[in-house]
Every structure is written in structure tokens, then in C-alpha cells.
Amino acid sequence: MPQWFTSKSDPEDTRIQETLKSSCVLPRHIGIIMDGNGRWAKIKGKSRIAGHVAGVESVRDVVEASSQLGIENLTLFTFSIENWKRPKPEISALMKLLIKVLRKEAVKLLENDIRLEVIGDMEMIPDDVRKTLDETIELTRKNRGMAMTIALSYSGKWDITQACRHIALQVKQGLLDPETIDENLFASYLSTASMPDPDLLIRTSGEYRISNFMLWQNAYSEIIFSNTLWPDFRRNELYEAIREFQKRERRFGKTSEQLKTNEVE
């Protein structure tokens, strides 16, 4: 398995990154639904876990490129709550792979000023995986570069439900006035409270859905659907998605004329 942050300096890649930085504003937060490992493996005549192993190289390249670009937040949809319904041998192999990758790359994350975070229902995560996650999070918690968040045992419906449950409990205990509940307060109870909403959401493998990922947070995200299967996704596809993002006009419910007026003011 290749190590992270060992790519040789490429003048052309550096030029592309500098062009992206100077062309227009970069997304502060990129979310990626990494899909297509199983189909990639089937096409290659390999096992599904071989597809997941191949996908690790894509993670490495995208994390490295995002960090080099100065992206503040990168969230990778790694494993959904619904994925617990998959065959147990596949789940076990995935969890072992996650532990192996975290242990192998933790020091690289530390050295490259990347902070690891995780969102999801941790009660469903096996103890050995939680222990490895906790160790890596603690190791990198003082880093101030890019925040790389793993969405593990996560679903948008779960996130909204757990926020509602916590708010309802505080109202019941008399600690929260229902009249003070607004969008900002609600968002502060989501698992993503410490990060901005995604500006750009990328979904690989040619599927056109967001698969229960950050349902609240993606309200105004620009969504790019890539036909590339995740194990074949590399920084060039990431750059192309960012170029497309930079071409789009983000109106947030306003008209183009209103945005132009605000720019003049």
C-alpha cells in the first residue's frame, strides 16, 4: 500500500494548483461521496475488498492535493449507517483496512499539519476501530492545517435525528426556550457544528444521488457528479470539479442582479 505524501514534485501539477488558487475563490469545504469500489473490482475480476484497497490510493492523492491547495475542510463519506447491512465478512475487512490505514498514515497526517476528525454514530463502531480513531485524533488535534473528516457510520437522517433528540431533551429540562430555536441554533447541534457547510460536493461512479449524506448541510452545496469510479479518481478529476465549481454562480436564493448589486456596494 503506497504511503501518503510521498509524491514527487511535479511542476505541471504545481502550475495547475497555482492557477486554481488565482482564478477564483476555492471551496472552503469539499465533501466527497466515494462510490464505485465494488464495481471497479467487478470489472477487474477482483474481490470487493480489493476495490476498497485500491480506493485508498485515491484517498491518498485527493487528501494530498487538497492539502496542497489550501482547502480548509475535506470530508470523506467512508461508511454509512446503511452499510452495516452489508455481508459481515466485507464489513470486517473494511474495518481492518481502516485500522491499517490509520496506523500507517497517522504520522504523515501529523507531519503535514492535517487534523483528523470523525462524524457518525460511534456507538456502532467496533472498539478496536474507535481506539485507533481516538489515538489518531488525539495525535493530530493540535494541527492547524486542513481538517480531514471521516464520515463513518454516518447518515444525514441520523444527524438530524440526534440533533432533534438533544434539543428536545434540553427543552424538557428547561435549559432551552423553544422560541430561541432557529436554523443557526439547530445547526449547532449537528455533528458538523465545528465546520462550515460543504461548498462543493463530489459524487463519483456516475450515480446521481447524495445517498443520505449531510442532508441539512448540503442545502446550498454545488454538486458535481463524476462518472469515474472511486479507485480511478485522482487529483486531476478533483481539479476539474473545482474548475466547474468556480464557474458557477452561487446565489443562495437571490437573483443574479441582486448579487451584482451587492458586489457594487
UniProtKB/Swiss-Prot annotation:
<comment type="similarity">
    <text>Belongs to the UPP synthase family.</text>
</comment>
<feature type="active site">
    <location>
        <position position="35"/>
    </location>
</feature>
<feature type="binding site">
    <location>
        <position position="48"/>
    </location>
    <ligand>
        <name>substrate</name>
    </ligand>
</feature>
<feature type="binding site">
    <location>
        <position position="52"/>
    </location>
    <ligand>
        <name>substrate</name>
    </ligand>
</feature>
<keyword id="KW-0479">Metal-binding</keyword>
<feature type="binding site">
    <location>
        <position position="86"/>
    </location>
    <ligand>
        <name>substrate</name>
    </ligand>
</feature>
<keyword id="KW-0808">Transferase</keyword>
<feature type="binding site">
    <location>
        <position position="40"/>
    </location>
    <ligand>
        <name>substrate</name>
    </ligand>
</feature>
<dbReference type="InterPro" id="IPR018520">
    <property type="entry name" value="UPP_synth-like_CS"/>
</dbReference>
<feature type="binding site">
    <location>
        <begin position="209"/>
        <end position="211"/>
    </location>
    <ligand>
        <name>substrate</name>
    </ligand>
</feature>
<dbReference type="GO" id="GO:0045547">
    <property type="term" value="F:ditrans,polycis-polyprenyl diphosphate synthase [(2E,6E)-farnesyl diphosphate specific] activity"/>
</dbReference>
<comment type="subunit">
    <text>Homodimer.</text>
</comment>
<feature type="active site" description="Proton acceptor">
    <location>
        <position position="83"/>
    </location>
</feature>
<feature type="binding site">
    <location>
        <position position="222"/>
    </location>
    <ligand>
        <name>Mg(2+)</name>
    </ligand>
</feature>
<feature type="binding site">
    <location>
        <position position="84"/>
    </location>
    <ligand>
        <name>substrate</name>
    </ligand>
</feature>
<feature type="binding site">
    <location>
        <position position="35"/>
    </location>
    <ligand>
        <name>Mg(2+)</name>
    </ligand>
</feature>
<protein>
    <recommendedName>
        <fullName>Isoprenyl transferase</fullName>
        <ecNumber>2.5.1.-</ecNumber>
    </recommendedName>
</protein>
<feature type="binding site">
    <location>
        <begin position="80"/>
        <end position="82"/>
    </location>
    <ligand>
        <name>substrate</name>
    </ligand>
</feature>
<dbReference type="GO" id="GO:0000287">
    <property type="term" value="F:magnesium ion binding"/>
</dbReference>
<feature type="binding site">
    <location>
        <begin position="36"/>
        <end position="39"/>
    </location>
    <ligand>
        <name>substrate</name>
    </ligand>
</feature>
<comment type="function">
    <text>Catalyzes the condensation of isopentenyl diphosphate (IPP) with allylic pyrophosphates generating different type of terpenoids.</text>
</comment>
<dbReference type="InterPro" id="IPR036424">
    <property type="entry name" value="UPP_synth-like_sf"/>
</dbReference>
<keyword id="KW-0460">Magnesium</keyword>
<dbReference type="GO" id="GO:0016094">
    <property type="term" value="P:polyprenol biosynthetic process"/>
</dbReference>
<dbReference type="InterPro" id="IPR001441">
    <property type="entry name" value="UPP_synth-like"/>
</dbReference>
<dbReference type="Pfam" id="PF01255">
    <property type="entry name" value="Prenyltransf"/>
</dbReference>
<feature type="binding site">
    <location>
        <position position="203"/>
    </location>
    <ligand>
        <name>substrate</name>
    </ligand>
</feature>
